Amino acid sequence: MEINSIKKDNMIRMNLLYPIISIFAFASSLRFLGYKVAFLVALMILAAPFFAKRKFLTLNLFLIGYPFLPDMITLMGAFAILFLYIVDIYIYKREKIVLSTFYVPVALVFVFILINTFTSLDIFGSLRDFSMNVAGIAIFLAIVTSIKTKEDYNKIATSLAIGAAFVCLWGILQFKFFGTVQREWVDADVSSQISARAYSVFMNPNVFAEYIVLLTPIVVSLFWAHKDGFKKFVFLGITGLLLLSLLLTFSRGGIMSVGVSALVFLFFNYRPLIALAIPFALLGMNFLPESIRNRIMSITNVKDSSTSYRFKIWSITKDVVKDHPQVGVGFGHKPFKETFETYIRSMPIFHAHNTYLQVMAEGGYTGFITFLVVVVVSIVQTIRVIYNTKNTIVKTFACGVLASIAGILVHGMFEDIIYINRIIMMIWIVLALSTSLTTISKQEN
């Protein structure tokens, strides 16, 4: 009775503390964020007790809707969700910290981007990318803390699939009724064949393709793992939406990356299907519209305008890396853009169209090594789950995550995958799924 009384008193004190914290937050953030944002921050803190009791639901709703949210709301939402879990761990004692070896590379990333931000050639320019990556780490920690079983993983992955369905439906509607194409999106030689490209909420078809590359293997793994016929039908439908949207982006890098993802998924999950998948894919090419088929066939054409444009960007970016080899020009795209334009004024670009060159330009060889550590550890831990788990469902989920990582790494050869905030967030989500499966595998074994 005495223990229950103490717990009740603590909860009363905490509930009284929220209004005080919200008033303080409103007053302190009013000057820097403006009235509307400051009011929203205060409102979120006031609502914390309600959402704290439903934090897993809140996390899932965030994962469904965040692609449609403004960056600032996404940022605040990510920190608010982590705050709910921290309160539950340290105040209410309803959650426990889930320990993982992957926290080491995550901590390494945080320390590096913090230093790289404040040693940047444009500190304020770097803060945008720094804050979004920290928000991504916040969601990473929330997901890893919340997923304790394969059922929890299934709920999180299903929320991502539902969000992907909405994003793709909007992309298809946008392509059909509001279709547009900007000059820089299409090669001059084929501009007459492509009158529109799908971009959904991402405002760029290549970025939309990055999102699809990350999500498609996750959704396929859900389809593969579920035995229920209705659920299989739903996930198959979402997979169809993702693949249709990918074709409507006309992103050659995206199509190639999803192809690699498919091979990785089948190699680790069911190798005999590879022999059927490749000829089936080649046969399917004949049924595609001519504009899409020609776009895919142009992958091998290194002389088209967009490819030659990229070659020139890569060449200049290599010069940036040579001139800033140790720690780069600073974290984020703004320091890179400002530095790049000192080399050539006639190419006002935002990034290097290659993640690996971009990372070296921003962070030097130190940043590139940090990036490699995260990539290698995430791949190794996921492969270990595949080979060590005794549960076929967990193995299938892990194959989906590994295929997602492999696909986005391939896509990173043609685009900067850590430039747009929505993609940065999704990458941290995929890393969280990988880490969670490692924990589940160890517990079940």
Please identify what each model-predicted range represents.
Residues F118-L127, L247-L248, M413-I418:
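Membrane-interface helix caps and helix-loop-helix hairpins in membrane proteins
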Residues F32-V37, D71-A78, R128-D129, S200-I212, ...:
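Membrane-interface micro-motifs in multi-pass membrane enzymes
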Residues I383-F414, V430, S434:
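Loop-to-helix entry and N-terminal half of a specific, functionally important transmembrane alpha helix
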Residues L169, F175-F178, L266-S305, S315-D323, ...:
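A membrane-periplasm/extracellular boundary helix in multi-pass inner-membrane enzymes
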